[in-house]
Amino acid sequence: MSTKQLEVVRPTAKFPPSVWGDQFLIYEENTAEQLEVEEKVKKLIEVVRKDIKSSLEVQTEHANLLKLIDAIQRLGIAYHFEQEIEQALQHIYGAYGDNWKGGNPSLWFRILRQQGFYVSCDIFNELKDENGSFKESLTSDVQGLLDLYEATYLRVQGEAVLEDAQVFTRTHLNKLTNSLTKTNSTLSTHIQDALEEPIRKRLPRLEALRYIPFYGQQEFHNKSLLKLAKLGFILLQSLHKKELSQVSRWWKRLDITKDLPYVRDRMVESYFWALGVYFEPKYSHARMFLAKVFTVTAVIDDTYDSYGTYEELMIFTEAVQRWSVSCIDMLPEYMKPMYQVLMGVYEEMEEILLKDGKEYQLSYAIESMKELTRNYMMEAKWAHEGYVPTTEEHLSVSYVSSGYVMLTTTCFVGMGDLVTDESFKWALSKPPLVKASCIIARLMNDFVSQKEEKEKMHVVSNVDSYMKQYGVTKEYAHNVLKNKIEDAWMDLTLESLTCKNVPMHVKIRVINLTQVLTVMYKGKDNYTEVGEELIHHIRSLLIHGMSI
């Protein structure tokens, strides 16, 4: 070994080990019990399908139909009724346009905008008095107040009436939580949950877990719907546990943390992240592929951030650009297993895609991975040179290094005919919808990992760049960048409504990816340092059963 090699000083981070051990390796399937549940689910689906159809046929029932659709979506069973829901909302939009007359305009507005219908917010001006303030009488209707609050998170830039409504509803809901704590603790908790995280920003799977017991406590709940939600949860959990067992065994076989002890061992958390993007059964192959790519990306990210020298990273970046097993020999010894695993994940998925003639999809995912490492390398260059980029310069690179362009493109792989060649090209072009998601990912990550990045000799965060560029305090920079996050959420909504050349089931993947961030970066980087709340979520979704 040369003297130069002996003198290498590596800024090694010390990450906590996995909290899960081997508990997900084994999955025992009860086929007979599962078949019995599946039969019950089929019958319940038909019952609910008839409810949707009968409500659609009677105009006076359209308000109740929206309530039914809202419950179906929040209970996590909308994937059974995608066609029926789309037809129902198309009918309602066609019949009423922006002139909804069925009551509860807040629910109408939120449900239609969630589904991609760009309905006007002018209807909320009717809730104001002659002085332009929201009527005080609204505060006596707690559910109406909550519905209005939730609707405000589907606003876009320039919708002042919804901005005012958010301030109004938040103020009064905060007051109500205190008075309701003793008289109606369930409703009080429901309101507190909404104030902490509105539906728009909630992870659908966790919302189902939260909403099922709440819905069951409502006096006039639909019993068939509730039973379907519970049985559906059991079936989904069984599938997800089976998938997690498969990817856990794959990760165990690789044993990459033995060769690379400096990396994060986060297979389970990676699967949870992928589960947030899509939980439906038809996306099983796509979900497992995304989880594997996510896990390997974390290993690569840690190598750029916490271990590799500048020269080594240049070699690795070049090897990824060439994307060939022949490049292994050019790599430092410790990087070879990582590169082999990266190649292996994509080769394995290619075999699956070949069966359906969809192998072309992989080329887009590979291109996005190449781009990601190029941006990792640019950040490594900045860190190596001690360079502090401007906020604009930083974000032009770091929104890509957030990984969300790569994850967006990669999550489409394996979705079959639902995603076309045009959808992949759209994602790689970094359209406003994807860029908004990336900005949210980057800034939320920067808020919670600013201190850790400094300790790892990483490039400074966007917070640091803003502080230096404008000579402001950390608190001021945080407030400015938090506003950027809220602006990005509104951009996300606007693009989901106006981007008509991409189907909603594709755009919803980007929205779901963004919603995962509210869990993973809540208070800290929960992926790196797994917190109790995330552990609770994973246990609830993948370990604990659902009582019928």
Curated annotation (Swiss-Prot):
The keyword Membrane is annotated on this UniProt entry: no
Example of a GO biological process term: diterpenoid biosynthetic process
Tissue specificity: Highly expressed in glandular trichomes. Expressed in leaves and stems.
Residues annotated to bind (2E,6E)-farnesyl diphosphate: 264, 301, 305, 442
Annotated localization: Cytoplasm
Principal subcellular localization: cytoplasm
UniProt binding sites for Mg(2+) 3: 453
GO cellular component: cytoplasm
Binding-site positions, Mg(2+) 2: 301, 305
UniProtKB keywords: Cytoplasm, Lyase, Magnesium, Metal-binding
Residues bound to Mg(2+) 1: 301, 305
UniProt remark on cofactor binding: Binds 3 Mg(2+) ions per subunit.
Similarity section: Belongs to the terpene synthase family. Tpsa subfamily.
Domain description: The Asp-Asp-Xaa-Xaa-Asp/Glu (DDXXD/E) motif is important for the catalytic activity, presumably through binding to Mg(2+).
Protein name: Sesquiterpene synthase TPS2
